[in-house]
Amino acid sequence: EKIQISRVFDEMGIDIIEAGFPISSPGDFEAVSAISKSVKNSIPCGLARATKKDIDACHESLKFAKRFRIHTFISTSPVHMKHKLNMNNEQVLDAIKESVTYARKFTDDVEWSCEDGTRTDLDFMYKTIELAINCGAKTINIPDTVGYSIPEEFAKTITSIKNNVPNIDKAILSACLLYTSPSPRDFG
């Protein structure tokens, strides 16, 4: 189905098709590879955690396309850094630098996301975004990974990023929304 959908998107003139997460399974790797071979106009994109192994899988699956994007990410919220990654701020910053720089070896089109962005300390988020852009990310994605934010807060976060990240004008800013109804915060 992914391949059929990507062909329709390609014919429609969709700019970017985020085709999958190649390292996640052999099926996803094959689907991303097939999409990268079949699209003629759209730019296929693969998702990768901030590791060389993930980025290598993205590159291997996307290399058939004339142009492609690697979308790398790492968790930046305190709860994810502590319990999911077992990393501190400096380690996360190092991982951002290494992963974006490494992805740039394969393509000029790198997207970076601060996973669980809406629960990330804003001052730390500004640092991560500025660093990712300085390392070559052309698109910055702010995801509401767990559906935490309400629309007004999310809008304030985006405005705050625009006002506090000095090099934000050098990147495209995007958002990934996961709004639940009702908000998880409604339950305390």
Task: Kindly give the residue locations of the regions a language model identified.
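Generic alpha-helical hydrophobic packing signal
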Residues: A34, S38, G136-A137, I168-A171
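Hydrophobic faces of well-ordered beta-strands that scaffold small-molecule active sites
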Residues: I17-A19, P44-A48, F68-T72, V110-C114, ...
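Glycine-rich, N-terminal phosphate-binding loop and its surrounding beta-alpha-beta segment
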Residues: A31-R67
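Short, glycine/acidic-rich beta->alpha junctions
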Residues: G27, A50, R185
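Glycine-rich, proline-tolerant flexible connector loops at the mouths of alpha/beta enzymes
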Residues: D15-V39, S77-K84, I142-P151
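Alpha/beta enzyme core
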Residues: K2-M12, D56-K82, N89-V110, G117-I168
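Single conserved hydrophobic/aromatic residue that forms the stacking wall/gate
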Residues: Y179-G188
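Hydrophobic alpha-helical scaffolding
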Residues: F21-P22, P44, A48, N89, ...
